[in-house]
Amino acid sequence: MNYIDLLKTSAKKTNNCACMGLDPIFEAIPNKTGMLKDNLVSFFKELFDTMHEKNLVPAAFKPNIGYYSALDKPREKDFSGSESLAEILSLIEKHFPGIPVILDSKRGDIARSSLNYAIEAFDGWKADAVTVSPYMGSDSILPFISEKYLDKGAYILNRTSNPGAKDFQNLKTDSEGKNNSELYIEVAKKIAFYAKEFPGTGAVVGATGMEELKIISGIYAQAGEVPMLIPGVGSQGGDAKTVMEVLKNSGCNLALIRINSSSALTHPWKKAPVPENYLELCINNIEKLLSETAINGISF
């Protein structure tokens, strides 16, 4: 089964195109044990147990590796963050079999270095897909999508959800005025080109720029099967219902879309003290996202 098939199968299984981001801030997680690793793992186990009981299953999970590696202290032989992520991934396999894991690491380097990062993601972490920066060009991207990793997914940063995205991504590509398209449009065209030869090549497109999303989703709808990972829903201000409407109007295959929300699902209280009903708050937001990203009646 290649990554396109995995996306379609998991969308059909869950009846949604939601992605649950797993980006824990240690200070915002209930402190029941006093131990970093035990706290993180026990929190996600409790959350996953409840989701499983209520049959709340998103169509993907996306841990951002930076939130875990930042908790490691390698020089002190302390790998609590990485060990936590390993156990959390095992919990996902147990509770939600067949649901893809997207390792959000935004890698991209010269060819051999990118191959090492691909090995890290796919052989080390056993991820199904990874996020990749396109800035260094094709030789930095191809190790993630060709040869031994043809059945994996790679989401290339296209038009991201952060405020600074416009600094580079919206720049005009031709100062002579012959071609006035923004850089993100040219990146989208290149991603569509890669996707024809390497199935599983996808794009990261933020939920915070609707005009850009309309343009990009139109490009991918015409290109064929191009997966999209759409972060920015929830705390960053993006709205899942609006995103779904744009995607439907563009003609995109919703089975290949994953709309991501992270902190709004795992610690919606943000910097406030952890409330007693923390689990209920998380579950309510998860239910809301799954409902807003439901894909009833689509063709797989």
Question: What is the role of each PLM region?
Answer:
Residues 208-260, 264-268:
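A C-terminal functional module that forms or caps the active site or interfaces directly
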Residues 20, 61, 104, 130, ...:
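Conserved, mostly hydrophobic/aromatic
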Residues 1-63, 68-98, 274, 280-298:
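Conserved N-terminal beta1-alpha1 strand-loop-helix module at the mouth
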Residues 14-18, 56-59, 97-99, 126-128, ...:
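Short, well-ordered coil/turn segments that N-cap beta-strands
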Residues 70-91, 110-114, 135-150, 208-219, ...:
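Active-site-adjacent beta->alpha loops and helix N-cap segments on the catalytic face
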Residues 25-26, 31, 109-204:
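Conserved anion-binding
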Residues 243-252, 256, 265-300:
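C-terminal helical cap(s) of enzyme catalytic domains, especially alpha/beta-barrels
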Residues 11-13, 48-57, 87-96, 144-151, ...:
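Acidic (Asp/Glu)-rich catalytic clusters
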